[in-house]
Every structure is written in C-alpha cells, then in structure tokens.
C-alpha cells in the first residue's frame, strides 16, 4: 500500500513522554512516547475500553495521566487550550433543539464553548467563513434539531476549527454517518491538516481515512504499537499485540482485520496500491 502523503519534518505540535493511564485499579497502558508533527495524520485504533478516548481527554486536560507528561506546541496541556480543536462523535441533537446552526458554530468563536457568548468584533464574519468552509452556509439560520446527523456534524467541525487549531483531536467523528457525509467530514479535516495542523483521529473503522494516514497508534490489552499502516496492519504484529491469533486479510481493494478480541467491527481498506488520494501531496 502506498501512502498518500508524508508528514513534514518540523518540530512536534504534540509531545507525549512516558505516559501512563489508569482507570480505577486497571492500567490502560503505560510507557507511551509520541510525537506528532504539524501536518501529520495519526489514526488511533483499538477495541472499546482500550483507552483511545481517554488519551484524547488527557490531551484536552480533562483526564490526568497516572504518569508522564503531555505538551502541546511546547507548553503543558491544559483544559481550555484554544490551540486544540476537538470534534466529538456524532450524536443527534434533540429535534426540539431551537439553537440555530449559526449559534452552535459561534460557541467556538466567541470566547467560550460553554455558558453565555462573549461577542467580539469580527465574530459574525468569522462564523460566516466557518459555515462556508464546512458547507453549512445554506442552513445557517435553521434550528439544529431539524438538521440531519451529517449536517450537525459539519457544524461541530466548524466549531472545532474556530481558532484555526494547531492540533485537531477527532473522536469517532464519522460514526453513524453515511458514506457521502463521511467523505465530506474527512475532506474538511484533511484540509485543516494540509494547512499545518496535526490530527489525531480515533476510529474503529480505518477504511474511510486510511489513504490519509501517516501513522497508526494501535492500543489493545494494555499494550500498543506505533508505526505506518503497512507496519502495523499485519497479522504478525496484531497477533503479538493481542496475544492471540489475529488475521489481516486482503479482499480486492479491501483490508480487513478479523479475530481481534472485543473489537467492534473490522478495519477495511478500499484504497488500492496505485491509487492516490484526491488531495494528496505530490
């Protein structure tokens, strides 16, 4: 499999050193050293409960590490860091939610993502630009409760991009979306990567993004492996990681991981070896 692009050789936007995470009495994993460069796309894979989302929460300053350190753009990670954008899993808002699409995006622009807005000069122009950028300008005045899941997720991405973040954390952002919306959301995220943002993308299904991925962090059973997709998505590597037989199978243009204990779904790949992504670097 060929990679669509290569991460630029620049100082790390994310530095994790000697990190360990614990949930109650159970250690999720330990000894993680990770650098993410500007413009790098890192996929985080593994079964439910392996600590993928908890890792994102730690980077966001919401979950303390049990050991180690996290630095974002050279500074210790902390809650409310506006150098970080966060795209959550798509969860439909209640149909009676009356907030306009514009107002949801504005929460990322006006100085707070919670509580009352703090208007600033130029906010409306910035919101308009974000709505246009995520393809949501034509429903900016509609109540979000009346929008489809894909339309709502575009707004969440717009909110995450409000401060032009240097690091973009994505937690299962394609879950529950149809193929067209998966491609649209992935394209928006990749555009931010092309502008220099590092991307951490948690997913159970690597298929929609594998053509963009530079490296994979695969976490399972309190252990992890880090490398390129070609290095990680191998039967031998995943069998060693899980401690039981796991098979990476090719079926035409698809790559499927089977036999992984407690994994939700499979990882499929529809990117042929001689195919390049439409927005790939030369």
Give the ranges of each region predicted by the language model.
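Helix-to-loop junction immediately C-terminal to a conserved catalytic motif
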Residues: 60
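Conserved ABC transporter NBD signature motif
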Residues: 68-82
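Conserved ABC ATPase "signature" region
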Residues: 120-139
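Conserved ABC ATPase signature
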Residues: 143-147, 151
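Conserved catalytic motifs of ABC-family nucleotide-binding domains
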Residues: 164
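Catalytic Walker B motif of ABC-type/P-loop ATPase nucleotide-binding domains
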Residues: 168-172
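ABC ATPase nucleotide-binding domains
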Residues: 234, 240-282
């Amino acid at each position: 499999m060929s990679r669509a692009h290569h991460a630029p050789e620049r100082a790390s936007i994310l530095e994790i050193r000697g990190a360990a995470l614990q949930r109650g009495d159970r250690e999720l994993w330990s000894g993680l050293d990770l650098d993410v460069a500007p413009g790098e796309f890192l996929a985080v894979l593994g079964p439910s409960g392996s600590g993928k989302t908890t890792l994102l929460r730690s980077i966001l300053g919401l979950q303390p590490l049990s050991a180690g350190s996290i630095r974002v753009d050279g500074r210790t990670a902390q809650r409310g860091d506006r150098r970080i954008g966060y795209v959550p899993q798509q969860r439909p808002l209640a149909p009676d939610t009356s907030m306009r699409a514009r107002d949801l995006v504005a929460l990322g622009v006006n100085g707070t993502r919670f509580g009352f807005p703090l208007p600033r000069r130029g906010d409306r122009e910035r919101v308009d630009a974000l709505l246009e950028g995520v393809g949501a300008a034509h429903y900016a005045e509609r109540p979000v409760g009346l929008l489809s899941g894909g339309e709502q997720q575009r707004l969440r991405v717009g909110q995450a991009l409000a401060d032009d973040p240097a690091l973009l954390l994505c937690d299962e952002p394609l879950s529950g979306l149809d193929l067209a919306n998966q491609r649209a959301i992935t394209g928006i995220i990749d555009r931010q990567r092309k502008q220099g943002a590092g991307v951490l993308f948690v997913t159970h299904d690597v298929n929609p993004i594998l053509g963009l991925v530079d490296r994979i962090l695969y976490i399972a059973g309190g252990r992890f492996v880090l490398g390129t997709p070609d290095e990680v998505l191998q039967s031998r590597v995943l069998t060693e990681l899980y401690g039981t037989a796991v098979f990476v199978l090719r079926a035409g243009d698809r790559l499927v991981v089977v036999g992984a204990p407690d994994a939700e779904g499979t990882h499929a790949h529809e990117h042929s070896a001689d195919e390049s992504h439409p927005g790939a670097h030369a």
